């Protein structure tokens, strides 16, 4: 996460995703309607951990401008692009395991996966 308001184990619904640090042809934005009562979040899909924060002031950030994105990720835009191409709706939930800049030893992946599983199970009820 890039936002100090989010903590390990929080689950959010990504409603907008932008691609960072790529040529203009690949710098796309993807938006989806809200489908849950989870907190809505925006994301930046990156190639390198920490790249979202490093590129916030660059013009290529599109809709974000200099606003701090809530979540940094590496795969979200790829899934969104495939779904757009196939004209298929999708929902993107993301569990927070760490803040950008945290050492890998500080990441709480197991806690995030557990929280995501609980959120998905609650939606099934």
Give the label of every model feature segment:
Residues 1-125:
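Glycine-rich phosphate- or other oxyanion-binding loops that anchor nucleotides, phosphorylated ligands
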């Amino acid at each position: 996460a890039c936002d100090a308001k989010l903590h390990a184990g929080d689950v959010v619904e990504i409603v907008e995703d932008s691609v960072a640090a790529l040529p203009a042809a690949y710098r796309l934005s993807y938006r989806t309607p809200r489908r849950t009562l989870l907190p809505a979040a925006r994301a930046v899909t990156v190639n390198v951990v920490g790249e979202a924060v490093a590129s916030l002031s660059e013009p290529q950030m599109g809709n974000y401008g200099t606003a701090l994105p809530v979540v940094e990720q590496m795969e979200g835009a790829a899934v969104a692009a495939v779904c757009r191409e196939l004209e298929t709706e999708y929902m993107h939930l993301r569990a927070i395991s760490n803040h950008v800049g945290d050492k890998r030893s500080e990441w709480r992946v197991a806690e995030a996966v557990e929280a995501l599983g609980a959120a998905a199970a609650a939606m099934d009820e």
